[in-house]
Amino acid sequence: MEQTWRWYGPNDPVSLADVRQAGATGVVTALHHIPNGEVWSVEEILKRKAIVEDAGLVWSVVESVPIHEDIKTHTGNYEQWIANYQQTLRNLAQCGIRTVCYNFMPVLDWTRTDLEYVLPDGSKALRFDQIEFAAFEMHILKRPGAEADYTEEEIAQAAVRFATMSDEDKARLTRNIIAGLPGAEEGYTLDQFRKHLELYKDIDKAKLRENFAVFLKAIIPVAEEVGVRMAVHPDDPPRPILGLPRIVSTIEDMQWMVDTVNSMANGFTMCTGSYGVRADNDLVDMIKQFGPRIYFTHLRSTMREDNPKTFHEAAHLNGDVDMYEVVKAIVEEEHRRKAEGKEDLIPMRPDHGHQMLDDLKKKTNPGYSAIGRLKGLAEVRGVELAIQRAFFSR
């Protein structure tokens, strides 16, 4: 695997020198300063590429080129936003950057309720608490019909939880959910959030798939033409939330994408932490079935709790993800490609490390502190080395 590291640009508290010292050779980044929907110019792409290369690294993957909400709702200026996206892909290819991670999650990108969940060893992790999320949705957001998405027990627990929250607790929970986590390109006030949800009131799973198909049929031929590999990121968490449909959550969703636009430019990001939240997702089977189309991997693990919809970020080699079998399947896919004369490694980045050690004293991007990811990268690197030596050494 190509060892990469997500970097949020010049304002990231983790420097490119840190990235290189961590042992990564590739950088995963994006032009976050460009508004959603606008074209990434060749000039801006080359500026960022030069910064990365001057540090002795390579810009391996774009994460992400965000998709404008008009495209997802098939309203407004969506045709222009699609044309802009096509041009951005052409410009990236012209600059030699050919792997693009993206997602089709409506309104919200990845979502957590607690950004400082304290683990038994004193380190901090990200957590999604189903009951706190229900309390937010029913008692703070007050979304009409929200009760239909929860069990009677969850509704009762959410009411109790909300009653014990201080004003500060409510503000923090609201901020965690709607203000935008690292990599998310949209942040909202509560009123803005309600208005954006309203835009989806008539969009169910079938309709969102229809809108996604319009996007894929416009974008994938351009990607194929210029040699760019599109790698869709799964929903996080991988299930409907806030009354919004989610359409990249299961192996059936992956098959739908391939059936909709059967091009090798139409591929996947294997995010083990996102897919792995669902107990019914067999990650190794997903890799084996869609291996030739996996162009990027996020390796992390989550741990489901007593309520199976509640989870926290586990250490990379612990939790519900069998990281050994996952890495073995990825390495096997790389060797399959090599046998076909393809030498390209699959970029991998350690995802969502714990905040630990000296980073506990620093202001960090939630999930993206240096030391936790350094630990995760070292652990995954060790797993891969053992697999390569045991099964593929000559």
Curated annotation (Swiss-Prot):
Catalyzed reactions: D-mannonate = 2-dehydro-3-deoxy-D-gluconate + H2O
GO terms of molecular function: ferrous iron binding; manganese ion binding; mannonate dehydratase activity
Associated pathway: Carbohydrate metabolism; pentose and glucuronate interconversion
EC number(s) given by UniProt: 4.2.1.8
Source superkingdom: Bacteria
Gene3D superfamilies: Divalent-metal-dependent TIM barrel enzymes
The entry's keywords: Iron, Lyase, Manganese
Any GO BP annotation: D-glucuronate catabolic process
Cofactor: Fe(2+); Mn(2+)
Transmembrane segments: none
Entry similarity comment: Belongs to the mannonate dehydratase family.
HAMAP family: UxuA
Function: Catalyzes the dehydration of D-mannonate.
Record's protein name: Mannonate dehydratase
Encoding gene (name): uxuA
